[in-house]
Curated annotation (Swiss-Prot):
Record-linked InterPro entries: DUF167 (IPR003746), YggU-like_sf (IPR036591)
HAMAP family found in the cross-reference section: UPF0235 (MF_00634)
GO CC aspect terms: cytoplasm
Entries under Gene3D superfamilies matching the protein: YggU-like (3.30.1200.10)
A Pfam cross-reference name: DUF167
Protein name per UniProt: UPF0235 protein RP839
Protein family according to the UniProt entry: Belongs to the UPF0235 family.
Organism whose genome encodes this protein: Rickettsia prowazekii (strain Madrid E)
Superkingdom of the organism of origin: Bacteria
Length: 105
């Protein structure tokens, strides 16, 4: 089984890779897809990828969906690309597993 995230137990932070599809009919988190041996969670966002609107939409949607504060979610890689790396701060690994396992099929 692939590791679907990287967790730092000292900082209580996690890195998750997402593959974003903008212009979606609805915001939706899909299952994982493997690209170049790296797992990405599929994410459809209604927002357009202009002037950071899609990135803001990603943060807002994930925070709401996963019941996290928006300030705890940060895009750290791929600001202008569909493949992104998300940093989640102040998260317990057990809660992270609960979130992630919902999307593993």
């Amino acid at each position: 089984m692939n590791k679907f995230y990287i967790y730092n137990s000292f900082k209580h932070e996690a890195l998750i890779n997402v593959k974003v599809k903008p212009y979606a009919k609805q915001n939706l988190i899909g299952n994982f897809v493997i690209i170049n041996n790296i797992p990405y969670i599929k994410l459809a966002i209604k927002a357009t990828p202009e002037q950071g609107k899609a990135n803001e939409g990603i943060i807002h949607y994930l925070a709401k969906e996963w019941e996290l504060s928006r300030s705890s979610i940060e895009i750290i890689k791929g600001h202008t690309h569909s493949l992104k790396t998300i940093l989640i701060k102040n998260i317990n690994e057990d809660y992270l597993n609960l979130i992630i396992n919902a999307y593993i099929k």
